[in-house]
Amino acid sequence: MRHYEIVFIVHPDQSEQVPAMVERYKTMIAEANGKIHRLEDWGRRQLAYPINKIHKAHYVLMNIETTPEVVEELETAFRFNDAVLRHLTIKTKHAVTEASPMLGGEKAKNLLSGASEEAVAQ
């Protein structure tokens, strides 16, 4: 199993759909015996440049450990989901579990059950 960092950007009108989308992606990873090491909902943020005349979008970060086949399935799901504006998948050498620098001084909206308090405290 390999480690990956995935960031995807969702259309702001579909922000309510993000938890359901994340749950679907978590299920795909779990079915292949993969692990989610970090899952962060960065919320709505300003885009660096407009995409289809949209200036804000909903960001989600996932650090996972799974097979390349599952990553391919996830990328296909991103590609065919009209709500996902952009996505980026990077292969990493090690699992990353600490809070990301994008969160800054904000509290993390950590979507992993049970780990939210621990991740914010560290």
UniProtKB/Swiss-Prot annotation:
- Which terms under GO biological process does the entry name? translation
Q: Which UniProt keywords apply?
A: Ribonucleoprotein, Ribosomal protein, RNA-binding, rRNA-binding
Protein's UniProt keywords contain Ribosomal protein: yes
rRNA-binding keyword on record: yes
Source organism superkingdom: Bacteria
By its UniProt entry, which SUPFAM superfamilies does this protein fall under? Ribosomal protein S6
MF terms in GO:
small ribosomal subunit rRNA binding; structural constituent of ribosome
Record's GO cellular component terms: cytosolic small ribosomal subunit
Which Gene3D superfamilies does this UniProt record tie to the protein? Answer: 3.30.70.60
- Known CDD domains for this protein? bS6
Task: Quote the function comment for this protein.
Answer: Binds together with bS18 to 16S ribosomal RNA.
Q: Which PANTHER family match?
A: MITOCHONDRIAL 28S RIBOSOMAL PROTEIN S6 (PTHR21011), SMALL RIBOSOMAL SUBUNIT PROTEIN BS6M (PTHR21011:SF1)
Protein family membership: Belongs to the bacterial ribosomal protein bS6 family.
What is the recorded name of this protein? Small ribosomal subunit protein bS6
Q: Which organism is it from?
A: Neisseria meningitidis serogroup C / serotype 2a (strain ATCC 700532 / DSM 15464 / FAM18)
Q: What is the lineage of its organism?
A: Bacteria, Pseudomonadati, Pseudomonadota, Betaproteobacteria, Neisseriales
